[in-house]
Amino acid sequence: MVEFCPKCNNIMLPKNGRLKCTVCGFEEELGNRTEEYELKEKIEAKKQEVTVIEDVDTLPTTRIECPSCGNMEASWWLQQTRCADEPETRFYKCKKCGHTWREYD
């Protein structure tokens, strides 16, 4: 069985009774599922270029609720994060607290 990270959608690998994301570091307890997971081969994660948006004042804004603070205004941008035949991912950054989250179409 393959598990994917709920934060960044990359594959999670079993390690010391836990599942760990190789990209963002998210961890999840395996509990009684340890026998389901056995690492057969280790494959190095592919490096991915990340665009850092620092000046959000130049980005378009929209009315959407921030899941962190409840503010109703965020800057947004699109980025191709998956295969070219799949839609772009929309990212939001709260204008009040700076929390960043993504939305898939």
From Swiss-Prot:
TFIIS-type zinc-finger residues: 62-102
Zinc finger (C4-type): 5-24
Binding sites annotated in the UniProt record for Zn(2+) 1: 5, 8, 21, 24
Record-given protein name: Transcription factor S
Protein family according to the UniProt entry: Belongs to the archaeal RpoM/eukaryotic RPA12/RPB9/RPC11 RNA polymerase family.
Organism: Methanothermococcus thermolithotrophicus
GO molecular function: DNA binding; DNA-directed RNA polymerase activity; zinc ion binding
GO biological-process terms attached to the record: DNA-templated transcription; regulation of DNA-templated transcription
Binding-site residues, Zn(2+) 2: 66, 69, 94, 97
GO CC term, one of those recorded: DNA-directed RNA polymerase complex
Record key words, sorted: DNA-binding, DNA-directed RNA polymerase, Metal-binding, Transcription, Transcription regulation, Zinc, Zinc-finger
SUPFAM superfamilies assigned: Zinc beta-ribbon
Source species taxonomy: Archaea, Methanobacteriati, Methanobacteriota, Methanomada group, Methanococci
The protein's role, per its UniProt record: Induces RNA cleavage activity in the RNA polymerase. In its presence, the cleavage activity of the RNA polymerase truncates the RNA back to position +15 in a stepwise manner by releasing mainly dinucleotides from the 3'-end of the nascent RNA. The truncated RNAs are able to continue elongation. Involved in transcriptional proofreading and fidelity. Misincorporation of nucleotides during elongation of transcription leads to arrested elongation complexes which are rescued by TFS-promoted removal of a dinucleotide from the 3'-end.
